[in-house]
């Protein structure tokens, strides 16, 4: 398209320099030999931890391996003129305290809330000249019921009750997200005083129990049962169940029929944006703009952030206490504490001298489940996708469904199950599960006029292909072509609109973003790796066996997603420990 070409030329190089980088180069750009605290990795959790520590009066520096901050919450211009949220792509789970306490709106964060938020087109022949059916869900419950009634009037009546049921569970779990887990080590091995102090960590559990009350057994089932079993108890129509089940498997090497998948379902419905519970939205300028806002808040209070500065090793004193880090260029930076936003595996198996860690602890970290089904494909297109189930208007302007998470190959939970089964044999799914998002439908700054960016979160793809083969360029392109063929069936003309793409298989996600196995949560969000077992039992309160070394990333409680809770909670624990030194 001509209009797209003109806009593309204007867009190249038009991105302004982030506020945090301007402030840092003006006042705090020189590396000092010593800080109170060092944060390894400028992912969103690391930036949050640094921002809080600096506010507490702890002089903090952040070292980032890449040329850009944000970790997986990053905006990158892979195709000239098109700005992609290259890894994470939606916002909802960010804790409201972080939004307000770090004054992120003041530091440039702008959000586009999505309503409606979910669109599931059917792959079927329209009858009587009508278009194929689809399921469109948003915040209007009456309209939701009308949509669901196309498939089941019984389900339409049950849906508000289901939403209320899940909202109550999310409300109960809320206090657990904003505090360290129960300190089992203090209970088991601490002094009497430490045991008494650790009793305070039981308060969030008590609060959760009070909210759930007599319905606790039903809610326990949600956390432990297969998501399909939970959904079958509420609904009968497959399009609705399959749409809801996508939240149970997103980013997880599981399927709706595996026990424990119900928890991941909850993990993705317990967020809020600007006071609207369960809302999801796009960040103006892409997810990197969120990281820039956190960094701006941090540097405004004195945090120093250094990009392209890889931490090679955690330094330990002869007395067995952290005393700083060594950078890849050989520079030594001393500090009282080190917080790692890297995964538990990188932190404890690569950066930390093994002689300072108990063998049992190292073995547990090495055994963490990091399997990932995800291949993320970022696509630049020169026109809006045109779905058979919801045709575009003549002006080609975005319609309500274009702002949604668009669920493809999602008419039936058995399709999700079959996609999972394929990958057990080392094969990418024949009919992959696809979540398609078009953030430029609400944020035109992401692409040249007339063009759009499309995010494809797809599964299931194995880390290693059948026969022990590694992914190569041909395999990547073959899989991406398969995904595009699937989209073409729902939206003819999609393949012809593509002007560029960026394919990230599980090994690519690991290489680029440091996600072990390509796992977006650092390690699986299964019940055996949650709360006081995250990352491992007895070391779930952000502390490690090595004094002065802390975990503050998604591998710590409460887990993955762009939440920031691990960074905030870890900062409070570190500040408490520093005061007692």
From Swiss-Prot:
<dbReference type="GO" id="GO:0016491">
    <property type="term" value="F:oxidoreductase activity"/>
</dbReference>
<dbReference type="Pfam" id="PF01593">
    <property type="entry name" value="Amino_oxidase"/>
</dbReference>
<comment type="similarity">
    <text>Belongs to the carotenoid/retinoid oxidoreductase family.</text>
</comment>
<feature type="binding site">
    <location>
        <begin position="38"/>
        <end position="71"/>
    </location>
    <ligand>
        <name>FAD</name>
    </ligand>
</feature>
<keyword id="KW-0285">Flavoprotein</keyword>
<comment type="subunit">
    <text>Interacts with COX5B; this interaction may contribute to localize PYROXD2 to the inner face of the inner mitochondrial membrane.</text>
</comment>
<dbReference type="InterPro" id="IPR036188">
    <property type="entry name" value="FAD/NAD-bd_sf"/>
</dbReference>
<comment type="function">
    <text>Probable oxidoreductase that may play a role as regulator of mitochondrial function.</text>
</comment>
<dbReference type="InterPro" id="IPR002937">
    <property type="entry name" value="Amino_oxidase"/>
</dbReference>
<keyword id="KW-0274">FAD</keyword>
<dbReference type="GO" id="GO:0005759">
    <property type="term" value="C:mitochondrial matrix"/>
</dbReference>
<keyword id="KW-0560">Oxidoreductase</keyword>
<keyword id="KW-0496">Mitochondrion</keyword>
<protein>
    <recommendedName>
        <fullName>Pyridine nucleotide-disulfide oxidoreductase domain-containing protein 2</fullName>
        <ecNumber>1.-.-.-</ecNumber>
    </recommendedName>
</protein>
<dbReference type="GO" id="GO:0007005">
    <property type="term" value="P:mitochondrion organization"/>
</dbReference>
